[in-house]
Amino acid sequence: MKNITVSSIKKKKNQEKITMITAYDALFARLFDGEVDILLVGDSLAMSFGGEEDTLPIGMDEMIYHTKAVCRGAEKSLVVIDMPFGSYDTKEKALHNAIRAYKESGASAVKLEGGIQKAETIALLSENGIAVMGHIGLKPQFVRAEGGYKVKGKEEGEAQSLLRDAKALEESGVFALVLEGVKAEVAQEVARSVSVPVIGIGSGSQVDGQVLVWSDMLGFFEGFTPKFVRRYLEGASLIRQGVREYAKDVREGRFPSEAESY
């Protein structure tokens, strides 16, 4: 696999499907690197890594720390950093934090949530040499305000709003869009309406690529599994089995053996 760039992602529109998963540290970044196109250092780490109820508590310092770690482990995959809640509520703050993310984390692009109301912010970042991935549909940073995680596009008005958002972000300079929690037929319409790749999560198959949280898809989270997640491994049970066997060997004097001693 050749090194993935913002330019090569844009060229995948209507061509090869784009693959993206989250990554939060160097260890897993090395395992994922080159297997997928994009490693997203998502603010989802607040939940899957930090045990929070939603993504809102995490800040810029933590995002940069984890992204630096991912960049140390990734050589081929494109690394994208999420702009956390409160880091881009004004255009000036967005530019300051995006520049900081670029300079300190090593990421190749930033991702931020919001539709047409964030168009001017995205345009400002793009004008200053920052590659931006948009995020519309279900926006996790808005769940408290919206009262939970709700599928979008069920009503005609919502569908038209999503189309307007996608077009506005395309015109503002995003190189790709994440479309989350959107009815499949509406997601297909959105993907067809713009020239940039649309990467879905819980938005059906008729888009330009897919993204999942790694701990969901590899079975490390044993709680609620969303409908859109496919488990490719039962990671939690494998890890627990290994730890259990280690503890048993120690207690019964089988570890370390003579071969494992100096």
UniProtKB/Swiss-Prot annotation:
Annotated active site residues, numbered on this chain, are: E180 (proton acceptor)
Q: Which cofactor does it need?
A: Mg(2+)
Q: Which residues bind 3-methyl-2-oxobutanoate?
A: D43, S44, D82, K111
Known Pfam families for this protein?
Answer: Pantoate_transf
Q: Tell me which GO cellular component terms the UniProt record holds.
A: cytoplasm
What keywords is this UniProt entry annotated with?
Cytoplasm, Magnesium, Metal-binding, Pantothenate biosynthesis, Transferase
One GO BP annotation of this record: pantothenate biosynthetic process
Q: Which reaction does it catalyse?
A: 3-methyl-2-oxobutanoate + (6R)-5,10-methylene-5,6,7,8-tetrahydrofolate + H2O = 2-dehydropantoate + (6S)-5,6,7,8-tetrahydrofolate
Indicate the enzyme's highest-level EC class.
Answer: transferase
| Recorded family membership | Belongs to the PanB family.
Q: Please report the name of this protein according to its UniProt entry.
A: 3-methyl-2-oxobutanoate hydroxymethyltransferase
Q: Which organism is it from?
A: Wolinella succinogenes (strain ATCC 29543 / DSM 1740 / CCUG 13145 / JCM 31913 / LMG 7466 / NCTC 11488 / FDC 602W)
